Amino acid sequence: MNQIQPRPKRRLFGTDGIRGRANTAPMTAEIALRLGQAAGLLFTRGDHRHRVIIGKDTRLSGYMLEPALTAGFIGAGMDVTLAGPLPTPAIAMLTRSLRADLGVVISASHNPFEDNGIKLFGPDGAKLSDETEAEIEALMEEDLSGRLAAPSALGRAMRLVDAAGRYVESAKSSLPRGLRLDGLRVVLDCANGAAYKVAPAALWELGAEVITLGVSPDGFNINHECGSTVPSALSAAVVKHRADLGIALDGDADRVILADERGRIIDGDQVLALIARAFQADGRLSGSGIVATVMSNLGLERYLGGLGLALHRTPVGDRYVAEHMRAHGLNLGGEQSGHVILADFATTGDGLIAALQVLAVLVREGRPASEVCRLFTPLPQLLRNVRYSGASPLLSPAVTAAAAAAEARLAGIGRLLLRASGTEPLIRVMAEGEDEQLVAAVVDELCAVIEAESAG
């Protein structure tokens, strides 16, 4: 049985930066200012001119958080480069390209507009480690008044006017030179989010016919009945327009979900399988495996095994996938939810670049997506959340015994995962296996035991 314990808890930072309801702690202007000061002080190392890149998605609250962060960084002595609405992977790329000390993205990813978040990237374009985030939190608790920049050492702010074009060119360069998408009709749903300009531009410049959805952000409609978490509109549009492929991004475009020409959804596991096969055939896959999380389907693991590839599993969160990839020299990883990290081209999940790799396979093989993108049959998988109060019941004797019994029933035909949520008082119970009825029974029984332990 896999039992995944949460990383050491921090007060503000979760698995993907700081996130919450806009204008409510921790997503207030005051906390954003404090964060800018603390992170700025931590990353003003050496005697060069220090710089931070700030990007955002299309939420209304971005207009509140962006100037607050800017003021904090300037007060710490850092120059601020404002990139405007751009995908998360674009900010990671620009952080490296501009030799910045830090990158900041203001986004709550796939969440509704009422939420917002802040995530930080180091000079290498990678998300900050848990330890570095803990250092920032500790600084935020201190009196920083005597450590901020002198009047003559304050930073400056400027806008990077060609930020979008730089990212479009970077994404296009992930395809082999000379490969074009002429003749392909693509439906693209940008979730009224950060990629609403750059993703259509990249596909159009590569020669595809692009039918767009979710490209009219108004500050309120990000992820609203659109994007990768609500792919039904994408599926319908693909069928209506007889498109070759549908591409749905989320609000900050770091994840992607696809639809084949029949409108059937293709999740992140299937995308990983396809890219792994293509990269292995081309000799571009580094190492002898790829990285995914504990949530990826056992069907993916078995398919990769047939190719002679291992599936390395990490806790949930694309940052942990990326860390494992770097530690083991692997260049492909991702999550079932659609985060796909191609380390040869990006340091974090990039929905557009992942979609381009799939389109490249369609061009080369000349077969429909329904044939190319369905390389394995997922095993039945069931996930249920159990809310508890008080102490976590995860390690109670009754739950441990019930989990061991469930694992024995799934031996050889499936697997079981129990993990505590890192952000809510929830126990996540996931089982998958060849027998759908058995999977459902195992989850029902375990949830009942957890609920009884919590109530007791």
Swiss-Prot record:
Post-translational modification (record): Activated by phosphorylation.
GO CC terms: cytosol
Cofactor: Mg(2+)
Residue positions of the active site: S109 (phosphoserine intermediate)
Protein name: Phosphoglucosamine mutase
Family, as annotated: Belongs to the phosphohexose mutase family.
Gene label: glmM
Enzyme Commission number, as recorded: 5.4.2.10
Residue positions binding Mg(2+): S109, D250, D252, D254
Catalytic activity: alpha-D-glucosamine 1-phosphate = D-glucosamine 6-phosphate
Function: Catalyzes the conversion of glucosamine-6-phosphate to glucosamine-1-phosphate.
An example molecular function term from Gene Ontology annotations: magnesium ion binding
Phosphoprotein recorded as keyword: yes
Cofactor comment text: Binds 1 Mg(2+) ion per subunit.
Protein's GO biological process: carbohydrate metabolic process; peptidoglycan biosynthetic process; UDP-N-acetylglucosamine biosynthetic process
Keyword Ligase among record annotations: no
Enzyme type, top EC level: isomerase
Modified residues (Phosphoserine): S109
Protein origin, superkingdom: Bacteria
Keywords tagged on the record: Isomerase, Magnesium, Metal-binding, Phosphoprotein
